[in-house]
C-alpha cells in the first residue's frame, strides 16, 4: 500500500523534502502558491525560483490546491517560515486531516509571544499530533540525494518512531526522539550563533575567532537547553551540535551568509531576512528571564539592534571576567 507525504511550501526546503519523499518511493505532493512554480515542477521537474539547477526526482505532484495535497496524507510537512507559521496554518490547518501528524520544518521562535513552533501550532490545531524535523541539512544536498541525517521529534514515542521510519530513505536517515522542545530549541538558537560566526569571518577575525564563538556559543545553547528542560543528548545530537556545526561554517546557510555580509559592512536591505535576526532578541530576552549567562547571544541582539559595532562586541567578549570553562 502506497504512502502519501504532503509538503506545504514551495520554497527550497519544501521542494527538497518533496524530492526526498519521492525518492523514498512515496506518493509525494507539494503545495505551492505560485502557479508558475507548480507548472515547472510538474512539467520540467525543476523549481525555477529555488534550486533551479537541480533536476528533481520523478513522482512529485505539485498543486495550488492545498486540500488535494493534504487529503489522505500519512504525514504533512509544514515548510512555512517560522514567523509566518501561525498565519499559514491558521489558513491551511483546517484542511489537514486530524489523523495526519503535522511535521514542523521551520526553525525559530515566534516574535511577540516567544513561543516555539510546536507551541504556536498547538494553539491553532490542538487536536493534531505535532512533530518537528530538524538537523544539519541543506536543501540542495537533500534535493540532490546526498547523504543526510536528521532528527524527528514528537512527544508521542510511537508517532516519532513511525515518522522516522516513514521519512527515512536511501540517503536520508531520521533518528527519533520524544524531546520535541529540545529539538526545537537547538534548531532555533543555532541561527543566532551562525550570525555571530559569519560576522567574525566577514570582519576578518579569522578561523580561530570563529571556532571560539561557536564553541562558547554552544555552551550558551546547552545552558538554555537545560533551562528549557531539553535533554543533554538532544543538545549534543544532530538537532543541536550537528546543526550548529553546519550552519556556522557554510555560506549555504542564510544566517551565516547574513553574518558575513554584516561583518563586511554590506548593504543588508536587499538580502532575504535570516531567521536568526528575528530570533536573536527573543533569545536574549529568554536568557534574561531565566537568568542565563549568554554574552554571545546578547551581543548578536545588540549588534542587530545597532547598539554596538562588531569590534565593540568582540572587545567586550574578550574583556569579560576570567572564569573556569563550563
Curated annotation (Swiss-Prot):
- Do the record's keywords include Ribosomal protein? no
Could you say which enzyme class this protein belongs to? Answer: oxidoreductase
Q: What is its EC number?
A: 1.1.1.94
Which reaction does this chain catalyze? Answer: sn-glycerol 3-phosphate + NAD(+) = dihydroxyacetone phosphate + NADH + H(+); sn-glycerol 3-phosphate + NADP(+) = dihydroxyacetone phosphate + NADPH + H(+)
**SUPFAM superfamilies the UniProt entry points to:** 6-phosphogluconate dehydrogenase C-terminal domain-like, NAD(P)-binding Rossmann-fold domains
Q: Where does NADPH bind?
A: 13, 33, 107, 139, 254, 273, 275
The UniProt record lists the keyword Nucleotide-binding:
yes
GO BP terms: namely: carbohydrate metabolic process; glycerol-3-phosphate biosynthetic process; glycerol-3-phosphate catabolic process; glycerophospholipid metabolic process; phospholipid biosynthetic process
Which Gene Ontology MF annotations are present? glycerol-3-phosphate dehydrogenase [NAD(P)+] activity; NAD binding
Record-annotated residues binding sn-glycerol 3-phosphate? 107, 135, 137, 190, 243, 253-255
Please give the superkingdom of this protein's source. Answer: Bacteria
User: Which family does the record claim for this protein?
Assistant: Belongs to the NAD-dependent glycerol-3-phosphate dehydrogenase family.
Task of the protein: Catalyzes the reduction of the glycolytic intermediate dihydroxyacetone phosphate (DHAP) to sn-glycerol 3-phosphate (G3P), the key precursor for phospholipid synthesis.
**What is this protein's name?**
Glycerol-3-phosphate dehydrogenase [NAD(P)+]
The organism of origin for this protein:
Brucella canis (strain ATCC 23365 / NCTC 10854 / RM-666)
Highest lineage ranks of the organism? Bacteria, Pseudomonadati, Pseudomonadota, Alphaproteobacteria, Hyphomicrobiales
Amino acid at each position: 500500500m502506497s504512502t502519501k507525504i504532503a509538503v506545504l511550501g514551495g520554497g527550497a526546503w519544501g521542494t527538497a523534502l518533496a524530492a526526498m519523499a519521492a525518492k523514498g518511493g512515496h506518493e509525494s505532493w507539494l503545495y505551492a502558491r505560485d502557479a508558475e512554480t507548480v507548472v515547472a515542477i510538474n512539467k520540467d521537474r525543476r523549481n525555477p525560483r529555488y534550486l533551479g539547477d537541480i533536476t528533481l526526482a520523478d513522482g512529485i505532484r505539485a498543486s495550488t490546491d492545498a486540500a488535494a495535497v493534504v487529503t489522505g496524507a500519512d504525514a504533512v510537512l509544514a515548510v512555512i517560515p517560522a514567523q509566518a507559521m501561525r498565519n499559514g496554518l491558521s489558513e491551511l490547518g483546517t484542511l489537514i486531516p486530524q489523523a495526519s501528524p503535522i511535521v514542523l520544518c521551520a526553525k525559530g521562535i515566534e516574535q511577540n509571544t516567544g513561543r516555539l513552533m510546536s507551541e504556536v501550532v498547538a494553539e491553532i490545531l490542538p487536536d493534531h499530533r505535532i512533530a518537528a524535523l530538524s538537523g544539519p541539512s541543506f536543501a540542495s544536498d537533500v534535493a540532490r540525494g546526498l547523504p543526510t541525517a536528521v532528527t524527528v521529534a514528537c512527544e508521542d514515542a510511537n508517532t516519532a518512531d513511525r515518522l522516522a521510519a516513514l521519512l527515512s530513505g536511501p540517503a536520508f536517515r531520521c533518528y527519533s526522539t520524544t524531546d520535541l522542545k529540545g529539538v526545537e530549541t537547538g534548531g532555533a538558537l543555532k541561527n543566532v550563533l551562525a550570525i555571530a560566526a559569519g560576522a567574525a569571518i566577514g570582519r576578518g577575525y579569522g578561523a580561530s575567532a570563529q571556532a571560539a564563538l561557536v564553541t562558547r556559543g554552544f555552551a550558551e545553547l546547552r545552558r538554555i537547553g537545560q533551562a528549557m528542560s531539553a535533554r543533554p543528548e538532544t543538545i549534543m545530537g544532530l538537532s543541536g551540535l550537528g546543526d550548529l556545526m553546519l550552519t556556522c561554517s557554510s555560506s549555504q546557510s542564510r544566517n551565516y551568509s547574513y553574518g558575513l555580509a554584516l561583518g563586511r559592512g554590506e548593504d543588508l536591505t536587499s538580502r532575504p531576512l535570516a531567521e536568526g535576526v528575528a530570533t536573536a532578541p527573543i533569545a536574549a530576552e529568554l536568557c534574561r528571564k531565566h537568568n542565563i549567562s549568554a554574552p554571545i547571544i546578547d551581543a548578536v541582539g545588540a549588534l542587530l539592534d545597532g547598539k554596538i559595532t562588531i569590534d565593540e562586541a568582540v572587545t567586550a567578549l574578550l574583556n569579560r571576567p576570567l572564569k573556569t570553562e563550563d
